[in-house]
Amino acid sequence: MKTILLFALSLLLSLSVSDVCAQERVYDISQFGLKANSKKNASPVVRKAIAKIKAECRDGEKVILRFPAGRYNFHEAGSTVREYYISNHDQDNPKKVGIALEDMKNLTIDGQGSEFVFYGRMIPVSLLRSENCVLKNFSIDFEQPHIAQVQVVENDPEKGITFEPAPWVDYRISKDSVFEGLGEGWVMRYSWGIAFDGKTKHVVYNTSDIGCPTKGAFEVAPRRICSPKWKDARLVPGTVVAMRGWGRPTPGIFMSHDVNTSLLDVKVHYAEGMGLLAQLCEDITLDGFGVCLKGDNDPRYFTTQADATHFSGCKGKIVSKNGLYEGMMDDAINVHGTYLKVIKRVDDHTLIGRYMHDQSWGFEWGRPGDDVQFVRSETMELIGKQNQITAIRPYDKGEIRGAREFSITFKEAIDPAINEKSGFGIENLTWTPEVLFAGNTIRNNRARGTLFSTPKKTVVEDNLFDHTSGTAILLCGDCNGWFETGACRDVTIRRNRFINALTNMFQFTNAVISIYPEIPNLKDQQKYFHGGKDGGIVIEDNEFDTFDAPILYAKSVDGLIFRNNVIKTNTEFKPFHWNKDRFLLERVTNVKISE
């Protein structure tokens, strides 16, 4: 009897394992004729592989697409062409995509340590309308970044700056004597730049965005260029400048309408936009994700053209842990929604709302059943009660894709004061996420370290902010410029270390931690924007190592605690910030500060 039971159990386990294996299908990209470290264009091969996977796999079946370790080259030719409207990016279409993943379930892309290298102007990876997908173990880079890295070799106050482009930079001096960068299918003229210390890779002290005028440039020797109109005494010989424009057409990874996505040990070394842009997604985990250089000996000083990671109109929980973010031209993480501006009151239940910023429109804003609230733009005060969408449709187009305006009908009557003349915004509360940002390193980047604008629980802990150049942590909210929602109600900032933030001035950088909602008319504000309860924002058990005065700036907060923090001063740089106060508070109540 015992033998029979053991046999039955063994058979049952065997069948269970077989059943699991049968539900997991593994593909290897080499099956499709693509080998690692070959010069073959990967774009059409990967496109065909994805089409085959979609055709062969049953709904719910687990699928793994593996890339044997090595380098894979993706060109525009043969890539997937799509019309994408991407939050906080240039809305130029069509977009060319190297690895386009759409309407997938239970898919894992495993690079096994591979390098995915792109050419031209492409979105390396897109993931849309997908569930339970994993991207892991690969890096993204471009053979010819659109940012031109140069090193100052001479700086003569009379003759101008002489510089040498990095070895990988292809360039020309145009017919009208302007330095231009070249790549596969693109030409760039550079108006601005960020200066890095040649030895430390820190952004050069008190430089912020620098002009790079190259009109009249000429070669004085092979790959040595004199720019007589470029004069800046701060750029001593040895300084490295990342010359750039302001365009941001293509993120490294674009995610939209996904549920339960994990990015594990993925590195973005360059993208002509943000490293990762996720919009209207639910539950995202980043573990070991990086927007970073290729190690301490990487000759590059820059990474992405904009933010490292950016989450627009997401919900569920965003987890970002154990990451490295360095050298990017904007924040390590930005979490927000988007206000629609009220441009017409149709009746007591219907408004027309509009996306206002030129880099944020064309994508879905809300759905029937979503909860919303209304804000007066001038004072950033809530008006009326929360409401619920019963119907929403694009107003200026026949479809959501590419729309800027929406007709929205609400369940309850709208407050009589809300109209198109006085400046009101609509905030979607359903599409707001909880955030955990933990165990990350942020260093040597332009602008700010992190930016959070969500009413859900936000925890920022155990991170290292090392020479972020601007504010390390910003809590914002803006219905006037970027139109990025919204108020923070439950924020904990703990056990972080801040080393010499604020070496430069950028937007909203009033202190190492800056709570800075954009409020045009603060003096007439009656309510408070951030907080709303005792300890709505808690800053505790952190270490600040700083050369300058401002540690905390706060505006329009109800419920702020600063306690058990250590503040150390150093002499690495000369204090220069206009804010000479350790703690500068404007319209803040229910506050407790103790070092």
Curated annotation (Swiss-Prot):
Optimum pH is 5-7.5. The gene is glaB. The lineage of its organism: Bacteria, Pseudomonadati, Bacteroidota, Bacteroidia, Bacteroidales. Belongs to the glycosyl hydrolase 110 family. B subfamily. Residues 1-22 form the signal peptide. Its EC number is 3.2.1.n1, 3.2.1.n2, 3.2.1.22. The keyword Coiled coil does not apply. Alpha-galactosidase. Removes both branched alpha-1,3-linked galactose residues of blood group B antigens and linear alpha-1,3-linked galactose structures. InterPro entries: Beta-barrel_GLAA-B_II, Pectin_lyas_fold, Pectin_lyase_fold/virulence. PbH1 repeats lie at residues 432-454, 455-477, 488-541. GO terms for molecular function: alpha-galactosidase activity. Keywords: Glycosidase, Hydrolase, Repeat, Signal. This is Alpha-1,3-galactosidase B. It holds the Pfam family Beta-barrel_GLAA-B_II. It catalyses: Hydrolysis of terminal, non-reducing branched (1->3)-alpha-D-galactosidic residues, producing free D-galactose; Hydrolysis of terminal, non-reducing linear (1->3)-alpha-D-galactosidic residues, producing free D-galactose; Hydrolysis of terminal, non-reducing alpha-D-galactose residues in alpha-D-galactosides, including galactose oligosaccharides, galactomannans and galactolipids.
